[in-house]
Design a protein with these regions (language model features):
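Bacterial Sec-dependent N-terminal signal peptides
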Residues: 1-20
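Histidine-/acidic-rich catalytic cores in large beta-rich domains
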Residues: 18-175
Length: 175
């Protein structure tokens, strides 16, 4: 009897072991064909619809909240840079980098200081420039002159949005 229990255990284990343990567990016929690009950590992954790894890039930085695969196969990735500790907000980033297909950093740029900080997203443009979404420090006086209700100011400052267009130059500069 022990022998039959053993045989049953071996066969049932082998059947369970055949279930998928890695990748996509549900595939819907209405799923768009293509790839998924995501950066959950210092690494960025490109996977197919079955969850198979197509490519991977490594970074020295924690991720910001956006990543783009560019037409030439390079990767535009936002980075979380919090070394200034001036402003802490949801979606804080502070930097961006472009990596080639082999993972070499070909351009890296920080857009953060005590008066401005990149956050959430960037947008690569067809001309090679990048739109950058950022917060910009306004003093209470500046904010009130621009129409802010003084009763709604916290810490006597305001961090409104601004968007700039930058042109990557060299390996770590921008116009």
């Amino acid at each position: 009897m022990k022998f039959f229990k053993f045989i049953f255990l071996v066969f049932s284990t082998s059947i369970v072991a055949q279930n998928q343990t890695v990748g996509v567990f549900q595939y819907n016929e209405n799923t768009y064909e293509g790839y998924t690009l995501f950066s959950p950590s210092r690494n960025t992954y490109l996977i197919d619809n079955c969850g198979r790894l197509i490519h991977e890039w490594a970074s020295n930085y924690r991720p910001g909240l956006s990543v783009y695969l560019l037409e030439d196969g390079s990767l535009l990735r936002t980075n979380k840079i919090t070394d200034l500790n001036v402003f802490q907000g949801g979606g804080i980033g502070g930097g961006m980098e472009i990596l080639d297909w082999e993972g070499n950093v070909i351009w890296s740029y920080s857009y953060n200081s005590t008066t401005f900080h990149q956050h959430h997203d960037v947008e690569p443009l067809p001309n090679g420039n990048i739109l950058v979404l950022a917060w910009e420090l306004k003093t209470a006086e500046e904010a009130i002159l621009l129409g802010r209700d003084p009763n709604l100011l916290e810490d006597n400052e305001l961090w409104p949005e601004h968007i700039i267009e930058i042109e990557p130059v060299g390996s770590n500069e921008a116009n």
